[in-house]
Amino acid sequence: MVSNINQLLVQARTAYDAADWSSLIQYLQQLILGADSEHPEIVKNQEYLLTLTLSMLEMGDFQQRWEITKVLTHLGKIAIPPLIDILKDEDAEEELRWYAARTLGEFQHPEAIAPLVELLKTDEDEELKAIATTALGQMGTVAITSLTELLLDEDTRLLAVRSLSCIPQPETITPLLSVVQDPQAAIRAAAIEALSSFHDQRVPPVLLNALDDIAATVRRAAVLGLGFRPDLREALDLVTKLQPKLYDFNIDVCCAAAVSLSRMSCDDAAKHLFDLLISPQTPITLQLETIRALVWVGTPSSLEYLQTAFNQITSETLWQEIVTVLGRVQKPQTTLAVEILLQILQSQHPATEIANIKSAIALSLGQLGKMQAIEPLILLLADSNASVRLHAIAALKNLDSEAAHQKLQQLVNNAALTLDLHQGIAIALAEW
């Protein structure tokens, strides 16, 4: 064992002297990441291994540096002081300082907090400060006190909020609440977004208040945050509170409101979404978001609203979106979704003359997996458009490949079928 370790140490030194960084990484990984990393001989040579590892960090390329940081973290806290020195060295290569900051965050050690905090206060490199922000967030609860102090300084407040948002611990709630009324909209939005991940009684009143914030980014964060609390739907009358945001001045807020209402999973929410969808004043991007939201509501009424909307609107883009999202419906509403698609397919609706929409219907029927769609899909094999026929074949295979194949074989010699359907069935069987 000792001889093998000594051999690896010699090989590592030889690779270092030859500037063979790829080999050096391999030897260091075997020594430090291997099963024998706690062996007394390796522990005795830790300082030497640290020297080699740091030289690798300084001299390696991007990928080699990425790999060597894993070795550094396994060396333990002896690696922290030299990494701090690199971080503080303003003359050091930017990428090297980037790696030092990132690696310090992975240690989650109190010693690493102060230099990262100091960097946020004094350094002008925005990218490096972003890395330090993430690193502090990785440290978890040990960094909360230092980050809370950074909230007091206007210059570091936003970065501190971003770091706190990376720490999913309830201890961050109080410091985050302290900045929800900050003059800077970016800080208010970041704090509200972070608070939204906590099911704490102090948070919902803040989110409700922020619905009317002057800044759209803050309103959007509040809308999305409330969407994560369907458990409070009735207690806080969330559907009524969120509905006006469907008509916000900012379309991003409107889209967020559609998503959040969909999470309420109730008929009232579906009705509000339907009203928005069929309004002639609604921009098409918001209509598309609303169509998706109606599917996410997941109630029979929400799917029926989609069918009603399909018959009222005249946009080919919206028609296609409706038949596409119906294919993503989950149980227990899959049967209803299939029935709606089949009714559309068998109707005289102008959309059924459009190849792209027929293809989308076929695809959705295949995704829903209901056998009642087999015969209507077989009829699509007679379509004059090759894309429609191919989508019908794919859908039949997706439903039940064996059952569909048997059905086609039964029909292949049926003299009552049209020539187009005969040809379509023959092509489908050849594709099987």
Language model features with spans:
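Short inter-helical turns and helix N-cap capping residues of alpha-solenoid HEAT/ARM repeat scaffolds
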Residues: 17-20, 60-61, 90-93, 123-125, ...
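Amphipathic alpha-helical scaffolding segments comprising HEAT/armadillo-like alpha-solenoid repeats
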Residues: 5-9, 40-58, 77-89, 109-122, ...
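Alpha-helical adaptor scaffolds
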Residues: 346-363, 375
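TPR/TPR-like (Sel1-like) alpha-helical repeat modules
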Residues: 29-33, 409-416
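N-terminal "cap/leader" segments of large eukaryotic alpha-helical scaffolds
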Residues: 1-29, 35-36, 47-59, 66
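Structural detector for internal amphipathic alpha-helices that build alpha-solenoid repeat scaffolds
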Residues: 10-14, 26-44, 64-77, 95-109, ...
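Short amphipathic alpha-helical interaction patches enriched in hydrophobic/aromatic residues
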Residues: 226, 326, 348-349, 415
